[in-house]
Amino acid sequence: MSQLNKWQKELQALQKANYQETDNQLFNVYRQSLIDIKKRLKVYTENAESLSFSTRLEVERLFSVADEINAILQLNSPKVEKTIKGYSAKQAEQGYYGLWYTLEQSQNIALSMPLINHDYIMNLVNAPVAGKRLSKRLYKYRDELAQNVTNNIITGLFEGKSYAEIARWINEETEASYKQALRIARTEAGRTQSVTTQKGYEEAKELGINIKKKWLATIDKHTRRTHQELDGKEVDVDEEFTIRGHSAKGPRMFGVASEDVNCRCTTIEVVDGISPELRKDNESKEMSEFKSYDEWYADRIRQNESKPKPNFTELDFFGQSDLQDDSDKWVAGLKPEQVNAMKDYTSDAFAKMNKILRNEKYNPREKPYLVNIIQNLDDAISKFKLKHDIITYRGVSANEYDAILNGNVFKEFKSTSINKKVAEDFLNFTSANKDGRVVKFLIPKGTQGAYIGTNSSMKKESEFLLNRNLKYTVEIVDNILEVTILG
């Protein structure tokens, strides 16, 4: 088994505690069901002693037993589902933030970490597995338990068994169902945790962290042979672990029951380096004291969640005038090569520059020149300070619309306008954009971007230029695609 650092050990202990808490909750739910069933069983067995054999066979009496058992289990069924979903959501959140916790603490660095969306987690928790939602699978096992318990009671009454004998049968059926629920909980929570951890790996790599992932198996007699073989194996973030014809980006993601169900494996990060840009703001910091995950979460996540929500507004005449003043002051403080880079981008160099950033084909002879413009434009944008939450617009083709809708980061610079009509006019400018749409951008203050306005080569575009590598989320509101910049 791979050696864990102290932060990874902290997370592992927390995961065990979460599992034990879920185990206790499920145990108590099934225990209460068993108590309620045994109360009815006591009545059945006491009454059966005074009934003739033919009376015991009455259909109405058999239906009564079945209905009462169903009612007991249906009463507690929502508690089982709520417990499993709560555990799954908690592990999904910890799978994501736990990675950032170990990265920040082990590397002594504060990272630009995007917050994970609650709706994203709940969609993940509720996602069907093998075509069936969690609720349907739980209903199936609940109905099986109800049928088995009912059959045991009726069979016992027919055969004249004692309360103790029938109760033992019911104990066994209930325990089996409880263990099945626990297996589902472990598998479901493990699945959501693996998905969000993978999401964290990919976002960390995009930030400039040279990171790999390593398979970590719990080595004991219950561990699958295939997972023992995977233990300690390292792959790149985007690669899959492969074993005997199956492949997956992480544990419980094979899509094969024989590899996924009740799996206790995890992955851990292996950091080979941090980009100089990420290190730059942390050079003077001393090594921080050890923080538990809960302490780190309180500092980094709850603190961000408690911040006031942005107040996005469309700029009126005075707001636009103030923004232009900020732009003029910004340009006055730029170096000549930075001003030239801005002019080049807003004239005819933007397409070639963005092709490089999107890793598309480009003319190698032009690369040094274009890369130099990109670097100067980066430096220029970093000096602009956006003071307010603003709304901008961009006219996009159908292809770009789909790319934005299905993405989460802009690798290239992105031109927008504070004037919606500019975006609308762009769509009418060429027939190639006849199926295009206007996209709305919600840009929080402090976002890495710059208002160019009349300092642009295209002075009437009222352009706000977003820097490259910005993360974002999307939402469709009133049939309009809204892009919220995260940073």
Swiss-Prot record:
Its main location: secreted. Changing E461A: Restores 30% growth in yeast. It catalyses: L-arginyl-[protein] + NAD(+) = N(omega)-(ADP-D-ribosyl)-L-arginyl-[protein] + nicotinamide + H(+). NAD(+) binds at residues 346-358, 394-400, 463. Residues 315-487 form the TR mART core domain. It holds the Pfam family Phage_Mu_F. GO terms for cellular component: extracellular region. A probable mono(ADP-ribosyl)transferase, it may ADP-ribosylate Arg in target protein(s). Upon expression in yeast cells causes cell death. This is NAD(+)--arginine ADP-ribosyltransferase EFV.
